[in-house]
Amino acid sequence: MKVPYAFATNMATTFKLSTMILPQLEQGIHGPQIAGMMFFDDNIFALRKNDPIGERLSKVAKEQNILLMVCDQCAVRRDLAEGTFEQCGTGQVKASGLVDGVVAGCFPQLYEALAGNMPDQVITL
């Protein structure tokens, strides 16, 4: 089974990702293949450069070919992207100040990125 995660609820990255999902991925015991992870709202803060969670996740994502994407509008609002609100959803916003491998985008970019690695289910946390 192949799944992407959408981290949309309060503290999803600081609790569910960092204490459950990430350790399981690091140990190779998580189960399904992870196609990607999409981060919304304050959940993107876990991906800031030098954040321990983000740095660990960046390493795992590179090893396991996991897409890491932040909501472009969420990143612009938090000064973690280069671009304007008018560019959101177009693919023109670039992630900035985040760990290696993170891209910024909206649903069109997410769908395009996952098209070559189509998931079976989507899990929103």
What is each residue range found by the language model?
Residues 3-19, 43-50:
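Short, glycine-rich nucleotide/cofactor-binding loops
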Residues 14-32:
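Histidine-anchored nucleotide/phosphate-binding helix
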Residues 20-22, 51-56:
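Charged helix-capping and loop-helix junction motifs
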Residues 30-35, 66:
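A generic structural motif
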Residues 33-44:
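A short beta-strand-loop structural module common to alpha/beta enzyme folds
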Residues 56-108:
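Mid-chain, well-packed structural core segment of small domains
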Residues 117:
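C-terminal binding/interaction regions
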Residues 121-125:
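Internal active-site segments that recognize and position negatively charged phosphoryl groups
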